[in-house]
A protein has these predicted regions:
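Redox- and metal-dependent alpha/beta enzyme cores, enriched for Fe-S-associated oxidoreductases
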Residues: 27-37, 44-97
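Nucleotide donor/acceptor-binding cores
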Residues: 37-40, 143
Length: 180
């Protein structure tokens, strides 16, 4: 995977502060992070309907779901599409509302079994995810976040670097294969 030594966020006028996302440059690093977590949430956004440089984001979500590690939450416009492809959605919810729930230390998750300790995000408009991750970074103690989009997100706990579509697909595929 090509990696920039100092990846740049796409929102160049915004300053993420001194604490920035750790770069996931190798699939093994993401596998280790996922294995350490107890309750994982995969959050999918409206841009999952788009193809990124020829890569079908829904296919990547299906690959990630096949590991059986994640509970899936989806933006309202994508939930039915995911269910049509065989991916059960625990909740159809706005990412802003979900961000508010994730920062609530008393929330017990969609299934009532306790708080999620890791939330992975894929398929969101860049600036939308930037804002949600900024809020979670500052106001959600005990929650780790991962940006699985092919663009560096400095407000996440971990993020992929800026990568091309084929590298993105290969990375997610290697993660999935390692977790089976």
């Amino acid at each position: 995977m090509s990696m920039y030594r100092f990846p740049e966020p796409w929102a160049t006028a915004e300053i993420p502060g001194p604490k920035k996302a750790a770069i996931l440059s190798r699939p093994e690093a993401l596998v280790a992070v996922l294995r350490r977590a107890n309750r994982r949430l995969l959050v999918t956004g409206s841009k999952a309907l788009d193809r990124v440089e020829g890569i079908d984001t829904i296919e990547l979500i299906r690959i990630l779901y096949s590991t059986r590690l994640f509970t899936v939450a989806a933006s309202r416009n994508i939930a039915s599409k995911l269910e049509d492809t065989g991916i059960p959605v625990a909740a159809s919810i706005s990412v802003y509302e979900l961000g508010d729930r994730l920062r609530d230390t008393g929330w017990t998750g969609f299934d009532g079994f306790g708080r999620y300790d890791l939330a992975a995000f894929i398929g969101f408009p860049y600036i939308t995810l930037w804002l949600v991750l900024s809020g979670l970074k500052h106001f959600a103690p005990g929650l780790s976040t991962i940006s699985l989009d092919p663009y560096y997100q400095p407000h996440a706990s971990w993020s992929l670097p800026n990568v091309k579509g084929d590298e993105w697909y290969s990375f997610i595929r290697k993660v999935s294969d390692s977790l089976r």
